Amino acid sequence: DPGAAVSDYRQFLEAKAPVPAEQGTPIEAGDIHPMLFPHQRAIVEWAVRGGRRAIFAAFGLGKSVMQLETLRLVTPTDARALVICPLGVRAEFVHDAELLGIDITFVRRTDEIDGPGIYITNYESVRDGKLDVSLFTAVSLDEASVLRSFGSKTYISFLQLFEHTQYRFVATATPSPNRYKELIHYAGFLGVMDTGQALTRFFQRDSTKANNLTLYPHKEAEFWLWLSSWAVFLQSPADLGYPNDGYQLPDLSIEFHQVTTDPSRSLKEDRDGQGRMAVVESLGVESAAAEKRDTT
């Protein structure tokens, strides 16, 4: 039967598609805190069901709220969850946790952990081995892009540290689409696909320039399909078909102010005897004060 043969071949091809399995738990809409906006509720439901997912959302779309609610729903009541974030972001999580009615505890060392619940720490505490991450069932990396600044050694250590963590999430602002290395590093952390396997499967290397990755032309569609199976990219709620109410900025109003100056002021020499054709930027307090005085 030709039809059956085509169907079997289609199933064979679909089985080869690298779509990650769902490793979380399904939830009902009523399980999610009513405070969340529709786009946040949809992402939380998707993340909890997946168990290992990435949330790439632009500033202001509620990454901290979504992470907290996801961890609350995915973590058993007798287990612990951990948010890892830059130190300066801690206050934002504490504030959002209060809005959600979630108790969250900041810790730097293992001996500060006491009982089940949601904890929060900074990247340095994990990097320096001060915190035993094996005590946590779920983890979410906030502003995960900061791992780039720590270097590849820290990234590799994070891969190893959380290799056996059941639920893993990353959240950061939308990465540039051409940051392929960053995207597959996230996939490696989440356990979606080994970094080396992703490099071999999707990319051709540039022998003339290190780390210059180019997608195989015949793999482009598969790559973006694979990416969308474990990561959500969001610039506005409208990207998911939800209203933009509260997220639409007013039209930009530009007002021009012309400051008149004396052109002869620029005809001076600097301390090295070099002539100046224009007034240079004032960086110091003294020069800035002089500039304000001369242009008022």
Predicted features and spans:
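Conserved Walker A/P-loop ATP-binding site and its immediately adjacent core
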Residues: 64-69, 78-100, 177-183
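Conserved helicase/translocase motor-coupling segment
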Residues: 239-296
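Conserved helix-turn-beta segment of the N-terminal RecA-like "Helicase ATP-binding" lobe
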Residues: 88-111, 190-194
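Conserved P-loop NTPase motor "coupling/switch" region that bridges the ATPase
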Residues: 76-80, 99, 138, 146, ...
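Short hydrophobic/aromatic beta-strand immediately N-terminal to the Walker A/P-loop
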Residues: 54-58, 82, 169
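Walker A/P-loop
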Residues: 50-70
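Charged, low-complexity
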Residues: 1-53, 118, 122-124, 134-137
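Conserved helix/coil segment N-terminal to the catalytic DExD/H
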Residues: 110-138, 149, 153
